[in-house]
């Protein structure tokens, strides 16, 4: 199902500002980007986007209260630099199973001051000698 429709179903007659957890697993992203997710989800603390075909998270909206972001089993390799600005309170980030090949891709994650957990399982970057 298309991501925008999936979000509409997940709202269940609530406003975006009422939602603290959003599960978009296995929905379909259009052109590898997030769609239908806006900064109106201002109370969102958990976002699951597992296996939705993402290639970039560059258009992620500002989600100040987001603490846990699940991006596993996608094809994302660009856009990680927006996380520190858009999700400054992120504690857990799961990027396992993405197309992350070099350290420069994850370098911007150093700016996430509250990050406690980073999962890069099966990402090619973990095979580098200086990882």
Swiss-Prot record:
It comes from the Eukaryota. Keywords: Leucine-rich repeat, Repeat. LRR repeats lie at residues 18-38, 43-64, 65-87, 89-110, 114-131. Pfam families: LRR_9 (PF14580). PANTHER family: ACIDIC LEUCINE-RICH NUCLEAR PHOSPHOPROTEIN 32, ACIDIC LEUCINE-RICH NUCLEAR PHOSPHOPROTEIN 32 FAMILY MEMBER A. Belongs to the ANP32 family. This is Acidic leucine-rich nuclear phosphoprotein 32 family member D. It comes from Homo sapiens (Human).
């Amino acid at each position: 199902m298309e991501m925008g429709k999936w979000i509409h179903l997940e709202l269940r007659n609530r406003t975006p500002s009422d939602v603290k957890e959003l599960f978009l697993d296995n929905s379909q992203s259009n052109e590898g980007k997030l769609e239908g997710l806006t900064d109106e989800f201002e109370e969102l603390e958990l976002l699951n986007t597992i296996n939705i075909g993402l290639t970039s998270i560059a258009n992620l909206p500002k989600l100040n209260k987001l603490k846990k972001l699940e991006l596993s089993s996608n094809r994302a390799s660009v856009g990680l630099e927006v996380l520190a600005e858009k999700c400054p309170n992120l504690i857990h980030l799961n990027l396992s199973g993405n197309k992350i090949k070099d350290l420069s891709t994850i370098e911007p994650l150093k700016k996430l001051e509250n990050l406690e957990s980073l999962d890069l399982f099966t990402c090619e970057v973990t095979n580098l000698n200086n990882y």
